[in-house]
């Protein structure tokens, strides 16, 4: 006879489960205090809600607060709140059942606006057990608000899978958690250490966290505890206040606090977003780039709070990488965290915050860049000098905002006689010559190299503006920025450069004539430069230089090849095209030279000079010097 169908429960070894949670769930020991303070904060919020319907629960003690007290002699740490407290059944149910959250259960009983107003933090029901990270025994004494003093309860456990519960008498409502510290954890009994943890994680929860006040004792040259209590947290989150109540000085002071920066920020935006994802954002644009802006191993991101409790310092998921320089705070009512609340999990809510924050930052930048006030535009100039190269990364990272980012770009240009990157693409388009349908640019290692590039000669002759691109990221950026306002971006170093209607018929006829006249010389030159140049031809794009190198359509530019090699990356060895200026004296002499060393040496010098002019490196500098010396002799 077959066995009957049964539904059975998984069995868990509670002792092993506790050990796993205590030693594996949290990566940072100090997290225990954040979790216990969060629980205490939840308890006071529960009391506030229940007291709305039943004011007697306050028991003439409406001063809600959390008290933290360390006893170095007894090696204990006490966390006390005068919140809702727990009955015997609640203590057994909430503390004796792992992953059961009383806060979550309470929250589910609220409805409508009550839920929106609730600042309850607990989510998983495991935060309490973080106490065992630093304590080998935990004692909880608690009395629920509204019940008699003799109905209080003591819950105690050593974290071995068992706990005891006793009835006690407790005059005050609320809960006291006493941690009996493990050996080697006395650091968490230091008042200075406790204050620093509180200010890091719980500075902005809505109620005061108090500790015994200490004063300096000159006789003992040490701090001495007094009977007074003092608040050690701000108990107020700036970002939760209405913007109209916050002064510029307060915004600046808060930025300097969270960013550890002595300078004032360039700009900030403060918004509360409501809808499917509810969160508050306070974002700043710094005035100076951090020293580690380009360190990919260093984490960059916003400070993340959930209901005003600090969760993490560098929440990289809340902004794209190209905005990693933004400082600020995101405070969400509900975000998917892992069980230890140390890692943010990707979700639609996280994506919505990232997209919303990105749009806010770009709007800030647009406001500065397009402002009618010179002082605001000057701020954008400062921003661009500090963070412009990082913003360029956005063209490849953020397809949805590509057009907005392109409008914010700034470049040096032949329009100005300096290296300042101040020309926008819109300004360039607005100055284009009649008949011009392309945006022209040149890339080089330095502004001087770009400004003096032989490729610009024909453009100067015709009065056509060319953008001078000298940032290492520019070549990569251009692979994503193919056009702007319907105008194609074209490198002046491309061999198939077509000026369209900007080239008159006489010039085209002259080019065809030169190609015919120099046909034999070009053929000889191709033979000499086989393996070094993909092609040789004459050009009228040069007016002062004898030669230049250009890239064939579809080939990687020489500048980009050099960048990749410098970065240790493999780069295709695309050979350049040598273009000769038939009107230059050095080139004219080629036509008069017979085949042989004289012709070869002069041609190779012209090739090497063109390579040097565009910032390239010679394969054999010594041979180049010898050839030049021959010509000079």
From Swiss-Prot:
The entry's protein name is Chaperone protein HtpG
NCBIfam families linked: PRK05218.1
Looking up Pfam families in the UniProt record yields: HATPase_c_3, HSP90
Which Gene3D superfamilies does this UniProt record tie to the protein? 3.30.230.80, 3.40.50.11260, Heat shock protein 90, C-terminal domain, Histidine kinase-like ATPase, C-terminal domain
Region C: start-end pairs = 563-633
Subunit and partners? Homodimer.
Task: Indicate the segments annotated as coiled coil, or none if absent.
Answer: none
Q: Which stretches of sequence are listed as region A?
A: 1-341
Q: Which gene encodes it?
A: htpG
Q: SUPFAM superfamilies of this UniProt entry?
A: ATPase domain of HSP90 chaperone/DNA topoisomerase II/histidine kinase, HSP90 C-terminal domain, Ribosomal protein S5 domain 2-like
The GO terms this record gives for MF are:
ATP binding; ATP hydrolysis activity; ATP-dependent protein folding chaperone; unfolded protein binding
Compartments where found? Cytoplasm
From which organism does this entry originate?
Cupriavidus pinatubonensis (strain JMP 134 / LMG 1197)
Give the superkingdom in one word: Bacteria
Family the entry assigns? Belongs to the heat shock protein 90 family.
Question: Keyword Iron-sulfur: yes or no?
Answer: no
